[in-house]
Amino acid sequence: MANVVVVGAQWGDEGKGKIVDWLSERADVIARFQGGHNAGHTLVIDGKVYKLSLLPSGIVRPGKLSVIGNGVVLDPWHLVGEIAKLRGEGVEITPDNLMIAENAVLILPLHGELDRARESHNAVAKIGTTGRGIGPAYEDKVGRRAIRVADLADEATLALRVDRLMVHHDALRRGLGIEPIDREALLAQLREIAPQVLPYAKPVWKVMNEMRKAGKRILFEGAQGALLDIDFGTYPFVTSSNVIAGQAATGTGIGPGAIGFVLGIVKAYTTRVGEGPFPAELKDADGERLGERGREFGTVTGRKRRCGWFDAVLVRQTCATSGVSGIALTKLDVLDGFETLKICVGYDLDGERLDHLPIAADQQARCTPIYEELEGWSESTAGARSWADLPGAAVKYVRRIEELIQCPVALLSTSPERDDTILVTDPFED
């Protein structure tokens, strides 16, 4: 029985929420394996809209186990708030259907303060962070000074962890002109939140492996997109974690052999939030039209997304680094009505044609797109549920994308509604 990893194959915001919800109906376990509460996802179920940023998408479905793995950095106050919000919307959340890795790292208020202070001091070279403390929390994890979920259970250990953290952070805060950490206030905050978090804490690696051996279907839910990966993204304009599919194993404690199918989520055009290179970006009327029709505003930040034509070079690259088995192509309906469509098929860098995005940031910034033009269509694709419902030009567009990215389409999404999906390959089938 195949276990499935879902990853964004662009810069995030590809429409993962709908696809994950569609798959989660048949999964037994839905696990998040990286990131924090910086990347939101929107679910539309029976006309009701749910906006999540930390909890796995499966939490809104009864009878599913939702898991927050050790690869996630966890803001405990945001967690408690998101749980309360969903409970207010009629969603049942208990330790029976939500599990948090004991070794997941906590995001503390000091992480957000540091994140925002750095961004304000770097006026010339902003990264485009959400300011929620994700990056600083990962820094503490790698620096071996982080506070983890399990530390909340022992007050003596917690105090030692806070003292170790303060040595590092107070030095940083002095340099940035921030007041020193109030040790007692931080400890009081952690003592207060601990009993609201600890009931969900479990040895996730152990439970996940038991589930696998029992033949349960596991869905690994990625956040953000592979082009924001700390190693393979447009560094330094990236997130602070690995986003590619291999992180699903590391971020939950299950072996890579457990992964059967990697589904890359790909928008039929390209968007990006925040700073960083974007070779196929459109700063004209076509770009505005894509943004308006696609409602391209961030779920968490509300920031307007930059829009551009489909970049086959980048998606081919992310399909390779994540070992994508098939893609889910979303938002095809946004392209309805364009007379001519363009696909980026290569880059020009100082007169040389490239078939990949170079790793150096200065070279990325100098890349200009090489386009191939395709005929558009005037008919509507919204709500199509079979290939026969699509205009011929739309089918040609999809087929050309498959050829250029060297990866087949497994699913085609034609609206935010979960049933408006054309299934080609079921990722859960053996």
UniProtKB/Swiss-Prot annotation:
EC number from the UniProt entry? 6.3.4.4
Reactions this protein catalyses: IMP + L-aspartate + GTP = N(6)-(1,2-dicarboxyethyl)-AMP + GDP + phosphate + 2 H(+)
Gene coding for it: purA
Question: Origin organism of this chain?
Answer: Cereibacter sphaeroides (strain ATCC 17025 / ATH 2.4.3) (Rhodobacter sphaeroides)
What does it do?
Answer: Plays an important role in the de novo pathway of purine nucleotide biosynthesis. Catalyzes the first committed step in the biosynthesis of AMP from IMP.
Identify which top EC class this enzyme belongs to.
ligase
Q: Name the residues that bind GTP.
A: 12-18, 40-42, 305, 331-333, 413-415
Which GO MF terms are attached to this record?
adenylosuccinate synthase activity; GTP binding; magnesium ion binding
User: According to the record, how does the cofactor bind?
Assistant: Binds 1 Mg(2+) ion per subunit.
Hey, which family's this protein in?
Belongs to the adenylosuccinate synthetase family.
Spell out the SUPFAM superfamilies in the cross-references.
Answer: P-loop containing nucleoside triphosphate hydrolases
The protein's matches in PROSITE patterns, at most eight in alphabetical order, are given as: ADENYLOSUCCIN_SYN_1, ADENYLOSUCCIN_SYN_2
Q: Which cofactor does it need?
A: Mg(2+)
- What name does UniProt use for this protein? Adenylosuccinate synthetase
